[in-house]
A protein has these predicted regions:
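A secondary-structure micro-motif
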Residues: 1-133
């Protein structure tokens, strides 16, 4: 988690998308008058609805145990993703707007695929909070 200097006085509420210039960072989870905590995308407690850009297959992505990658189980009703496919938010969960960059598929196993986020979570200086319509 990270702390940001924006809160209720800035019209920030829980479950707002947080992004930087590289893509999705996470979502607000604990908002006070002037500060908020952000649950990072890489946290194992984080999950987001995503789609691949190439074939628009939909899935649920969560933080992997390594704290770096994101992992998703295959959805048997969707097309198989490929290594190198770009992943964006689907917008279906109504927390994140659609088409925010998330990352790139770097590994596929029998049951899962792994995504390397575009955001460098060790170097987050500035973020923006995105309001969902």
């Amino acid at each position: 988690m990270i702390n940001i200097n924006a809160g209720i006085k800035d019209r920030v509420i829980n479950n707002m998308a947080v992004v930087n210039h590289r893509g999705l960072v996470g979502r607000t989870v604990d908002t006070s008058i002037s500060n908020s905590r952000v649950l990072l995308l890489t946290d194992p407690n984080s999950s987001i609805a995503i789609k691949t850009i190439s074939n628009e297959s939909y899935s649920l992505l969560r933080g992997a145990e390594d704290g770096v990658h994101l992992v998703s189980s295959f959805n048997k009703n969707e097309k198989m993703p490929k290594i190198g496919d770009l992943v964006v938010t689907s917008g279906s969960a109504q927390v994140f707007p659609s088409d925010i960059l998330v990352g790139k598929i770097t590994k596929i196993t029998k049951n899962n695929f792994y995504v390397l986020p575009f955001v460098d979570f060790k170097k987050i200086d500035y973020v923006q909070i995105v309001e969902t319509k």
